[in-house]
Amino acid sequence: MVVTLAVFLALAIGLVTRGCMGNLAQIRIRWWPLLVLAVALQAYAVGHWATDSLGPIPLRAGAFVATHVLILAVAAVNFRLAGFGLIILGAAANLVALVANGGLMPVSAEARVAIGHQATVDALATGTAVMGSKGVVLPATQANLWILTDIFVLPPPFPLPAVASVGDVLVALGVGFLIITTMHHSSEIKIGG
């Protein structure tokens, strides 16, 4: 959700500051099929979580870790593009948090309530995986590397209430920087390789 917001904000900022959307066609992201695979795998894992059809938690958690490994690989080979340094840091932070917590991203019950998911919290015991997400309800005292987990809250009236991690914020900033920077490059400048 945070990355989606960053894309729209960056496009708006780029346009308001007289950037050219046509320049975005210049971006050449190497290994982009791995990024598509990562997004598809994560969407499948999150979408099938509620139906319990993806298998036991280790398999599902493994799918979430795998998506972040793929994202980190794509970010690493594109490190020379504007914003990809932040994307690498964010993807690495998320991967470390996931691995440290068994492949799931801890989120506090208070954060879930703040974004309007009281019913979900009431139904879940501490340590239970959150259906339809990669999250697990854990208080800060039980989460490994708590500072890297989903601790930032975007509550209502935000259009898409969500919780985010430090990694999510870094990835969002990197994506936003890539978009704005690219919109302000002239068409003669090649971005990426």
Residue ranges and their predicted role:
Residues I180-G192:
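Membrane-interface capping segments at transmembrane-helix boundaries
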Residues P58-A66, P161-L173:
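Membrane-interface loop-to-helix entry segments
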Residues L70-N101:
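Interfacial segments of alpha-helical transmembrane regions
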